[in-house]
């Protein structure tokens, strides 16, 4: 199941052994869970007042695990490149410590020096008998105009159909 909402039906599905890709709409994450973190493609290292849209960045970009099978069909290096532009503009940060501090994300958002939160963009866990893959990027809105979102969605859903989808952490 691919969903942008964690409702009672989705939780029941997970507890009974289902697989869920949770891809919330931009802005849908509560402040306590990371919603206060504003993402942008340029990092705060650069003077973002000079950027075209005066984006309000918060973080230093992302670090990925390019060898992780979830990204097998989404070409990437260990750091942010232009294929991540769309994800950063449509993404939500998730505070991993609020879920389980042991989670090692597939894609980590590098926080700034003021908060130094452990932030995830893509991570996985077990819930009951089921498995959840959380992608903080809204992969469902305006898909026909977002090639990168379609490809990332394809990569993640393909991964979920393999035996490699085997989260280590239970939440």
Which residue stretches match the model-derived regions?
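Short alpha-beta junction capping motif
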Residues: 1-45, 129, 133-135, 156-159, ...
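Catalytic beta-strand/loop cores that center a nucleophilic Ser/Cys/Thr
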Residues: 29-32, 42, 47-145, 168
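Short, intrinsically disordered, charge-balanced linker/junction segments flanking boundaries
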Residues: 165-171
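Short amphipathic C-terminal alpha-helix that caps PH/PH-like domains
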Residues: 148-160
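Solvent-exposed, acidic/flexible segments
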Residues: 3, 146-149
């Amino acid at each position: 199941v691919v969903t942008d909402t964690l409702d009672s039906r989705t939780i029941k599905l997970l507890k009974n052994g289902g697989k869920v890709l949770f891809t919330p709409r931009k802005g849908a994450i509560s402040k306590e869970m990371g919603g206060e973190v504003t993402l942008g493609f340029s990092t705060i290292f650069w003077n973002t007042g000079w950027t075209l849209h005066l984006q309000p960045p918060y973080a230093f970009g992302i670090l990925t695990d390019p060898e992780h099978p979830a990204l097998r069909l989404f070409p990437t290096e260990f750091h942010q490149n232009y294929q991540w532009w769309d994800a950063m503009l449509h993404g939500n940060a998730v505070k991993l410590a609020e879920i389980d501090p042991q989670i090692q994300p597939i894609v980590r958002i590098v926080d700034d020096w003021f908060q130094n939160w452990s932030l995830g963009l893509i991570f996985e866990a077990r819930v009951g008998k089921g498995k959840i893959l959380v992608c903080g990027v809204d992969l469902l809105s305006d898909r026909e105009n977002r090639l990168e979102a379609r490809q990332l969605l394809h990569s993640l859903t393909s991964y979920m159909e393999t035996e490699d989808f085997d989260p280590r952490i239970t939440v």
